[in-house]
């Protein structure tokens, strides 16, 4: 370093730290009065600004239109009319695929409504209205996503279809709308997914009156087996004759009860399809963040979108209600709990989008529209922004390069102050991270997980309050060590360092082609201020500086708060069905917005009047500051926890219950010699959240409930009667089991028979293989667990052939029959991994026959348990439990 540069840095350091050489604090305060620093009034305005911003984004997030009546011209979607049939369908009760409620009551009511609409409009000129039904069978495999992957066979599942068009001849081009009318075994399906079916029936009424809108045919698919792993949609898109004309689809789903429906998947490719929604939707609510989060597998759920995309090779849109997810797949999912205005909003959006889509020239020749990945999001629910990802990359890189250039110039011209600001910026971030980590641990240790489950604002108290408080107070403390005349440069440098960090994050998103990086691009809008400062003087008036800073920070901070509100409202209910520690995820969501606010205000904090002297800004004061933040926050949480000791709440209008699952199981386990080693009746209690099974009141008080102890060493499912392969969602703390006295007596006990066993040798490597044929007899819903010994691998099944040899496999068989009894034949081939002699019985087969409906569904033990829960939860929050419970007949045998 040259002598001139050293001298310049020395002078810079002297000017910056001049405050330490002042003779007394009084002189310091006089200097502060002479320069343009922010006063308390400015900070009152800043606080009011962000308070209004938080309230405003929350209001916009929850805003819904008023339900409407039909208009005289029959051109207006009417929630009031749609909800009448919805209420009737919901009142049929639990309706899993194959049940009487599903196959007779619900299916026939939808058919009746379709026939009534057709009869009422039979004289409408130029209307073609076809109705069809389907009972379909097939097999396919589902890769790991919502579950851990499985092979599925189904038989006799039902579909109801209506096809509307203009003119006598069927159009060769059509658009598909899909809903499902079956339910989770213990749910009325008011929202998931009868609300979508009611919406589609209302659209059929409108198009029946206005066939001139039907430039192409529209197929309405009411499918009867989605909850059983997307079966009916697969049967339709692979076997029905109407499938060949479909050019696009709109899938309507629900993982919550009302609220604003979210477009969270679009494609694959076919940008014109996404544009139809973005250009036509009256109340758009979409985000590429939702699409990328869902496709990552973080969100626990799957929809028929996968089936139409993967097996039909058709592009589409996936729309779903995602708010109020507490009631999804529970007894509380009834029609009356759907937020008023939700169907009106969704119906208007789908109606306008479909009308736009039917006019699109790309529906006839979609290949002529160049496919490209896009960035899309709605800004606070007010309007939609969409642009190609290639343009996003270009803008991102230009912005990043600009920020880096500004930072490089600042580092060269103001080296010491840059190092000083960087040190303080890092200290502020580390302090926020330390406080968050401490609050996560202390809140979990002191008050338990999910305290914010019912009252979301408690998450803001637990994580938002200490983040903002710690960040601003620590930055103010560090600033107190500086000379007042140096704070302008110091504050500007802090702002530039913050922009550089955001640029680094945006660079990573750009490099990995993650479209969600738009959020960080918006946080770089304040770079305009740094550019202006570089080319000219930025006004020193504190009021002007405050207002302009807030205006430039508004797009990024508003979207950060809006996105956090959206993610919290979606993911907090999901935490009730996740066995992972939820505190880090929720603290991160809250801290993201809090951090965006605090760090964007770092420059203003540095340019504010500060009552501290340099002697009051040491390490000890920093420690006291952090401890004070933690102590006050924990005290506030303690006070709130004394009022609400349980995270759950029972309320007929808005219950937030603990999710549980119970299996009453007849369990018969055989050893290799074919002898029965276990013949027991067991009761499995499963908690789906992190608080675990010990949080269930009657489990906690009963010492006979114990943890899992696997009978077979190599059984990854540990004899737990999983309906689907979801063992990865649970850990040891989530499952408790005990023996019970009530032995289940089934009319048709589950049976597994080995039909044949043929040994062979692979001609390529000389290793042995065995081909088995089996027959399984059980209920309409059977889970099969295939578990070879450790020196064997599964190479083939009659359902599908695995891409690579598997250590174990999960098969799921479902069928619809009046007596709920089905027989399945399947083959399995296993291959030895060594050339040692073959074992006599190297294959373990487990069968769980699930009673999901009918008179044998629930034992007296289950009924008594549910009655006790319903009685106690009215007065005791800890008893606020919702239970999915049914009987299972299970057997394991070696072959």
From Swiss-Prot:
Residue positions of the active site: 226 (proton acceptor)
Q: Which residues lie on this side of the membrane: Cytoplasmic?
A: 1-39, 396-424, 479-489, 539-553, 606-619
Residues covered by region (Disordered): 1-27
What are its GO biological-process terms?
proteolysis
Q: Which CDD domains match?
A: M28_Fxna_like
Q: Which UniProt keywords apply?
A: Coiled coil, Endoplasmic reticulum, Glycoprotein, Hydrolase, Membrane, Metal-binding, Metalloprotease, Protease, Transmembrane, Transmembrane helix, Zinc
UniProt key word Glycoprotein = yes
Q: Where in the cell is it found?
A: Endoplasmic reticulum membrane
Q: Name one Pfam family in it.
A: Peptidase_M28
* InterPro entries with a match to the protein in the record: ERMP1-like_C, Fxna-like_M28_dom, M28_fam, Peptidase_M28
Entry's EC annotation: 3.4.-.-
Q: What is this protein called?
A: Putative endoplasmic reticulum metallopeptidase 1-B
């Amino acid at each position: 370093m040259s002598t001139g540069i050293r001298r310049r840095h020395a002078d810079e350091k002297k000017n910056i730290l001049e405050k330490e050489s002042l003779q007394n604090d009084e002189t310091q305060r006089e200097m502060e009065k002479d320069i343009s620093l922010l006063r308390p009034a400015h900070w009152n305005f800043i606080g009011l600004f962000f308070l209004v911003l938080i309230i405003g984004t929350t209001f916009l997030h929850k805003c819904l239109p008023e339900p409407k009546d039909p208009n005289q011209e029959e051109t207006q979607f009417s929630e009031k009319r749609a909800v009448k049939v919805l209420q009737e369908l919901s009142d049929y009760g639990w309706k899993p695929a194959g049940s009487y409620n599903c196959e007779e009551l619900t299916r026939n009511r939808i058919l009746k409504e379709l026939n009534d609409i057709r009869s009422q409009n039979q004289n409408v000129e130029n209307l073609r209205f076809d109705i069809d039904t389907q009972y379909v069978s097939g097999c396919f495999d589902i890769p790991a996503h919502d579950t851990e992957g499985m092979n599925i066979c189904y038989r006799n599942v039902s579909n109801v279809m209506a096809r509307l068009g203009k003119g006598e001849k069927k159009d060769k081009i059509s658009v598909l709308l899909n809903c499902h009318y079956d339910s989770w075994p213990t749910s009325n399906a008011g929202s998931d997914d009868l609300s979508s079916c009611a919406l589609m029936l209302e659209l059929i009424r409108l198009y029946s009156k206005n066939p001139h809108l039907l430039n192409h045919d529209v197929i309405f698919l009411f499918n009867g087996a989605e909850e059983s792993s997307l079966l009916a949609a697969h049967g339709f898109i692979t076997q029905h004759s109407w499938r060949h004309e479909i050019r696009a689809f709109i899938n309507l789903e629900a993982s919550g009860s009302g609220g604003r429906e979210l477009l969270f998947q679009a494609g694959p490719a076919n940008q014109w399809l996404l544009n139809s929604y973005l250009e036509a939707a009256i109340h758009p609510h979409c985000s590429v963040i939702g699409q990328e989060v869902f496709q990552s597998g973080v969100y626990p759920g799957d929809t028929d979108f996968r089936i139409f995309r993967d097996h039909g090779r058709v592009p589409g849109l996936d729309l779903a209600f995602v708010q109020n997810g507490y009631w999804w797949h529970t007894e509380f999912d009834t029609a009356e709990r759907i937020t008023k205005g939700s169907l009106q909003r969704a119906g208007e959006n789908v109606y306008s989008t479909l009308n736009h889509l039917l006019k699109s020239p790309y529906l006839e020749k979609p290949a002529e529209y160049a496919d490209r990945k896009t960035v899309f999001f709605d800004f606070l629910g007010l309007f939609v922004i969409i642009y190609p990802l290639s343009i996003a990359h270009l803008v991102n890189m230009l912005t990043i390069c600009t920020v880096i250039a500004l930072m490089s110039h600042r580092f060269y011209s103001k080296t010491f102050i840059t190092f000083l600001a960087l040190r303080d910026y890092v200290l502020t971030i580390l302090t926020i991270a330390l406080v968050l980590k401490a609050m996560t641990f202390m809140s979990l240790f002191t008050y338990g997980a999910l305290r914010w489950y019912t009252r979301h604002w408690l998450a803001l108290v637990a994580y938002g309050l200490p983040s903002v408080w710690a960040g601003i107070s620590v930055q103010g403390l560090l600033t107190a060590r500086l000379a007042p005349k140096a704070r302008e440069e110091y504050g500007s440098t802090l702002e530039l360092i913050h922009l550089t960090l955001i640029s680094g994050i945006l660079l990573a998103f750009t490099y990995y082609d993650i479209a969600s990086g738009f959020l960080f691009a918006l946080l770089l809008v304040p770079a305009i201020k740094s550019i202006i400062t570089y080319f000219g003087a930025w006004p020193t008036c504190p009021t002007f500086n405050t207002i302009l800073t807030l205006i430039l920070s508004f797009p990024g901070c508003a979207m950060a708060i809006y996105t956090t509100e959206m993610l919290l409202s979606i993911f907090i209910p999901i935490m009730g069905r996740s066995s992972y520690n939820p505190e880090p995820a929720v603290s991160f969501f809250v801290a993201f917005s809090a951090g965006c606010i605090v760090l964007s205000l770092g420059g203003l904090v540095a340019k504010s009047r500060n009552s501290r002297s340099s002697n009051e800004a040491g390490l000890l004061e920093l420690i006291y500051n952090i401890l004070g933040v933690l102590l006050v926050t924990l005290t506030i949480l303690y006070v709130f926890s004394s009022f609400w000791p349980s995270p759950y709440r029972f309320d007929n209008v808005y219950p937030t219950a603990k999710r549980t699952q119970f299996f009453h199981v007849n369990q018969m386990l055989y050893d290799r010699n074919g002898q029965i080693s276990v013949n027991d009746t067991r009761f499995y209690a499963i908690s789906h959240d992190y608080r675990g099974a010990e949080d269930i009141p009657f489990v906690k008080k009963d010492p006979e409930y114990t943890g899992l102890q696997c009978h077979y060493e190599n059984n990854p499912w540990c004899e737990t009667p999983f309906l689907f392969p979801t063992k990865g969602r649970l850990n040891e703390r989530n499952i408790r089991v005990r023996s019970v006295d009530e032995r289940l007596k089934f009319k048709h006990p589950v049976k597994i028979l080995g039909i044949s066993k043929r040994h062979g040798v692979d001609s390529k490597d000389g290793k042995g293989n065995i081909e088995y044929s089996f027959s399984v007899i059980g209920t309409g819903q059977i889970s099969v667990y295939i578990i070879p010994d450790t020196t064997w691998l599964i190479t083939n099944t009659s359902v599908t052939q695995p891409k690579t040899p598997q250590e174990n496999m999960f098969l799921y068989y479902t069928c619809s029959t009046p007596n709920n009894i089905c027989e399945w034949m399947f083959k399995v081939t296993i291959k030895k991994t060594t050339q040692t002699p073959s074992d006599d019985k190297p294959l373990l087969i487990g069968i769980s026959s699930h009673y999901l409906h009918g008179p044998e569904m629930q034992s007296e033990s289950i009924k008594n348990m549910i009655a006790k829960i319903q009685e106690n939860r009215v007065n005791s929050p800890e008893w606020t439990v919702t239970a999915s419970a049914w009987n299972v007949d299970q057997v394991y045998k070696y072959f």
